[in-house]
């Protein structure tokens, strides 16, 4: 809230009373002018009536009346229906709609959600409107529920306003009380211009999200415009609207309660600018409705649990998707991709999935194979060989269907009438195959068509997943606007491409029509989302195979269907660093399976850059090397230094595969990211809020990469506690409070540390995930003097679509470790043990880190069906050695079945009985 405007309030104890009652001096009409029009953008609304539903106490409805019309950006809508409702105890929904006319909003069948409470009756059925509230008697209407910490206050001022705050702290989370002299703070509601603004405490609010944009920092910088309009703009361009739209932000407060976090989501698919100045956030939307959700949190994990409960939990990914992937645009033929696979094997670098870009197609047409360079028989042999080796194959698809009249896919599409139309005919665009029509994925017939085409292709070539690209949708031409149309040329110009470029530029025109008489203007940002839905539907048939899908264009909720990569980055050191904020942002957007093109896509990479990039990229949730044609090849085996680093870091990644897969299970269960900012684990450490060069995998493994050329030192932030290096377990960082430390990082090394209090189940290194899954488990236990150590391991067949669901083909193991004065206990609990027992998975070794004394086995018991059985220690070896002030103890030759609960008691050397 702007302190300079405080005279408009007449409450003497503003700081205390504001969340409960706002006393506003109502001034005359605003004199703030729009720079271009010479008149105010709008004058706001006043409350005509407001009522809390006393039967539930969970909703409030009101009718709002326009104060005065303004012609800027078109005429205002005169009457608005307003509702505020508790969707859940921790989720408050705020909705403004036209009281008399239905407006576009995302269909419930596209993004399922609970219905809002009934709106006030339309004006035609209102017999008597209440008289205007006298301006000298401002009142409030409060919505509060005993089960929620959130409360809503509606201010009957002129113009009206509202706040959402925490009852426990009186911290205002969303403050839409207007400044009477400033129309940019008013609610404005026109057909093609909607405005909603909230003041923010600039020094206490730390905002993240509102993508997709490439930025150097994870935390949003002040004084910027964030535009949401899906566009085929290379991601090496900073601060421009890119492939996806995610109108969600998370706000972590540094006071009054440090680390208190909430989320804000505007459910709207139309183009928009979000202006963020630090002390204010303002939405400027060119259509739809205002449908705002506030998630109470109050931790970051709780916010994402609440957010993904609404938009959809992240899809489970097959186990093999966590392996290493290789791709390039420009592979000449099937012989070249076979050679690439062979050379990875010769170099002993793990390779899980081979990809092909558009090169494999016949003249770039979907669902075809180049008969000369990628003939069907050779491709079938190639995929068969991959599968025999435990490897996979994923090709690319673009949505544009070439209009060649002899092309079977086009013929069937025309017969089914499935393409987007303009002026009554299929809209003709142009992409890689030349002239194309675009399937209308809002049309059930188009979804069926797409599913059938994928089935036809999979029937001849057993692909393992699909990569969908160019689905913003991209168009190589810009069609002329329809004369006089305010859709192709809206009155408010969003900051498209950073220069208010027309929204028709290089995409489907806004006047094109979808199924159900929906305009492209309204549905544009949903195109990639809808294609992801249809493509995943195709991939779940047959249902016995876990689907994998990667999409460039995304929207809120896309994580329910697809993974994502950061798009066309460049082989630049800046892009290496930018990949971290983008990865962390997509974790917030409910898309935890995220990564960047390792070594860079555009431009030619260098040996040093590629070496440092694979060191970082090995820890992306989605880890893929991808490059553009006409650039230097960058397969990891081409430089010995890169190959050596790849063997090391991918070896560690494959050891950590059970950990990554367990994190994916948690993401599907609660919406938690796989790659996380340091602030997620350390929300009370304000210094972590601005860190964009390090990240966590899960809650306890910290990655601190080299991001500058020629550097052999990393100035890394170390939150409080003990951190042990995962490269050798022998070096550690111990700090009582968070501080920056200098870490050695020679060219072949990346710093990866595990924090005290964590237990991680690992398996052995291997060339494929299939081979890694057959190796014994190794339990890594990091002890803490302050908390018990814990960890989890989720196990299933690696391709389940209903992960952890009914049917019993899964096991969850929880691990615990705690030390006393003379002893230490490590134990496990097993949920649904039958599946793990049937697989006969074995844990062979336990490594204990962070000990201050040597230990030896005192007692070892396992849980049998008949009860706990004491096991003699014969055959089990315990070794300890001191490194860096801590002992490392290894208990080997355990042969412990993972599906069997156990308890291991260890005695400290020199302990008295």
From Swiss-Prot:
Record keywords, A-Z: Glycoprotein, Glycosidase, Hydrolase, Signal
Glycosylated residues in this chain: 54, 404, 495, 517, 728, 823
S-S bonds: none
Biological process annotations from GO: carbohydrate metabolic process
Molecular function GO terms recorded: alpha-1,4-glucosidase activity; carbohydrate binding
Span of the signal peptide: 1-28
SUPFAM superfamilies on file: (Trans)glycosidases, Galactose mutarotase-like, Glycosyl hydrolase domain
Biased composition (Pro residues): 112-123
Taxonomic lineage: Eukaryota, Viridiplantae, Streptophyta, Embryophyta, Tracheophyta
Family statement drawn from the similarity comment of this UniProt entry: Belongs to the glycosyl hydrolase 31 family.
Superkingdom of the organism of origin: Eukaryota
Protein name: Alpha-glucosidase
Known EC number: 3.2.1.20
Function, as annotated: High activity for alpha-glucan.
PROSITE patterns per the UniProt record, alphabetical: GLYCOSYL_HYDROL_F31_1, GLYCOSYL_HYDROL_F31_2
Enzyme class: hydrolase
Post-translational modification: The N-terminus is blocked.
Active site residues per record: 469, 472, 568 (proton donor)
